[in-house]
């Protein structure tokens, strides 16, 4: 019998604590929750572990402030960083969170040199590229959670529009995890039926736009923070696909090297996820308009990467 997987979650805020909890509930492995705030991850982890007898989950959960306790992790999920506040775009967080991601990634690479890193911190695509650059890991072992969350939001809005089960809906959202993401109605179906057969074009466009600003809608409603239930579950879906070698196709932020005409930039594309992380980028046949939108989205990410390079974060 193989040993249980070790999952480290960096950052014990709302997203991080829920990633840890959902990993434990699904018994994906033993979980280490780490944060710079003294005693806080220990308290949250203890509370979670005290819940395990009630549902009979066989996962150990520990909290720590010491990266030595994260050594030899199979997967490291990085959620640490400042969340968005009302009126902020994800890009406004660039310099604040770059310092955090650089420091965290250096520790991750030191203690878990064979791990797969999943980045959740915004601005997502740029932070994922920074983590890849700092870690020195191969590109398949550093990826970002983005498109599967955006696709889940698109699916939720379609289900609300049609009054059908979300289980019936498949959707694909590509591009950077920002306001210029690229939902693809052409690749979106309800029980195999294209949504273009079920929803008028103007309503599809409204749902696409709501998906683009879906995170901001929640920030505006909450007023004191950003979304965490859906981002956490979207992340855990990726963790599960990798640890169980499920070979699932999910849109995530991966390093493009020529795919879709995008070079040297992390961007949301359909990825085959398995034990090696991103095992393949799937190239869809996009229309000219879809491809232009995807490349424009990647261009915005490139602008953020250029700033990080100028500031000395990316070598």
Curated annotation (Swiss-Prot):
CDD domains: LDH-like_MDH. It catalyses: (S)-malate + NAD(+) = oxaloacetate + NADH + H(+). Its EC number is 1.1.1.37. Substrate binds at residues 84, 90, 122, 153. One of its GO terms (biological process) is lactate metabolic process. One of its GO terms (molecular function) is L-malate dehydrogenase (NAD+) activity. The active site is at residue 177. NAD(+) binds at residues 11-16, 35, 97, 120-122. Gene3D superfamilies: Lactate dehydrogenase/glycoside hydrolase, family 4, C-terminal, NAD(P)-binding Rossmann-like Domain. InterPro entries: L-lactate/malate_DH, Lactate/malate_DH_C, Lactate/malate_DH_N, Lactate_DH/Glyco_Ohase_4_C, Malate_DH_type3, NAD(P)-bd_dom_sf. The keyword Isomerase does not apply. Pfam families: Ldh_1_C, Ldh_1_N. Catalyzes the reversible oxidation of malate to oxaloacetate. Belongs to the LDH/MDH superfamily. MDH type 3 family. This is Malate dehydrogenase. It comes from Thermosulfidibacter takaii (strain DSM 17441 / JCM 13301 / NBRC 103674 / ABI70S6). The lineage of its organism: Bacteria, Pseudomonadati, Thermosulfidibacterota, Thermosulfidibacteria, Thermosulfidibacterales.
